[in-house]
Amino acid sequence: MATPLFHGSIVALVTPMTHGEVNYEELKRLVEHHVQAGTHGIVSVGTTGESTTLSIDENVKVIKKTVEFADGRIPIIAGTGSNATSEAIILTKLLTNSGVAGCLSVVPYYNKPTQEGMYLHYKAIAESTDLPQILYNVPSRTGSDLKPETIGRLAEITNIVGVKEATGDLTRLPLIKKLAGEDFIFLSGDDATGLESMKLGGQGVISVTNNVAAADMAKMCELALAGKFDEAEAINQRLMALHHDLFIEANPIPVKWAAYKLGLISEPNLRLPLTTLSEAAQPTVLAALQKAGLI
């Protein structure tokens, strides 16, 4: 089977900010960093990119700037999710002809739709665009779980091409493959189980860890895709503390602080209601960076 466009180590990119405003010069440097490190794709303004605290205009500008900075060297996936179907459609349409390779759309959060509601939500979005759509299931944040059976139904829609599955439940992967078909792209949204999902046939990881360990994550995923799981596991074990401790507080709080400590961004700050990593948690994240050999 040919390698799909969306595969390997895909970074859920942080959005750098200075004094509360998006810093586009730093964003340009981050994109270049990932191109040079071998990252296989970038998710722009997903959860890690603080999509919920950016305005629609800011979302679109950050995504378009990311595409501009990438200059065709790496596929850009746009975070376009909303818990209002109409808003998700608006954001998706605003990216027509923008150069994005596809869209990542989170399960509607807070309002807890039924499985039929989720199906109709994604169907309406897909029918509004020609852009490839990736479903994003993260029940710990949304309060709703997109079931494998619903994913199977959605896979019948031509431009719904894959899923980011962030439950960490590896039993779902073979079931989703069975229901959605072997060509349906399965991307782990859980760094701690990402390599295990690739051993079971997943095509890659949409990764938070990649923000601070881009070259390692790219190499690990390349080894996994080549079936060299022992070598991939050696890298994975070195990064395992990061996989866990970058979630010691709500993402992207720890990873922004970690990126700041590594000099990748100039400020660790986020927009309210998110706050900078607490002093109590900082030694844990610092130790994880040390275990990974990054400092």
UniProtKB/Swiss-Prot annotation:
GO molecular function terms listed in the Swiss-Prot or TrEMBL record: 4-hydroxy-tetrahydrodipicolinate synthase activity
Chain positions recorded as pyruvate binding sites: 48, 206
Record-linked InterPro entries: Aldolase_TIM (IPR013785), DapA (IPR005263), DapA-like (IPR002220), Schiff_base-form_aldolases_AS (IPR020625), Schiff_base-form_aldolases_CS (IPR020624)
Enzyme Commission code: 4.3.3.7
Sites marked Part of a proton relay during catalysis: 47, 110
UniProt catalytic activity: L-aspartate 4-semialdehyde + pyruvate = (2S,4S)-4-hydroxy-2,3,4,5-tetrahydrodipicolinate + H2O + H(+)
Pathway the protein contributes to: Amino-acid biosynthesis; L-lysine biosynthesis via DAP pathway; (S)-tetrahydrodipicolinate from L-aspartate: step 3/4
Active site: 136, 164
Pfam families documented for this protein: DHDPS (PF00701)
One of the GO BP terms on file: diaminopimelate biosynthetic process
Keywords, comma-separated and alphabetical: Amino-acid biosynthesis, Cytoplasm, Diaminopimelate biosynthesis, Lyase, Lysine biosynthesis, Schiff base
Keyword Methyltransferase: no
Assigned GO CC terms: cytosol
Superkingdom, natural source: Bacteria
Location in or out of the cell: Cytoplasm
Function: Catalyzes the condensation of (S)-aspartate-beta-semialdehyde [(S)-ASA] and pyruvate to 4-hydroxy-tetrahydrodipicolinate (HTPA).
Assembly notes: Homotetramer; dimer of dimers.
Protein's UniProt name: 4-hydroxy-tetrahydrodipicolinate synthase
Native species: Actinobacillus pleuropneumoniae serotype 3 (strain JL03)
Phylogenetic lineage: Bacteria, Pseudomonadati, Pseudomonadota, Gammaproteobacteria, Pasteurellales
Encoding gene, per UniProt annotation: dapA
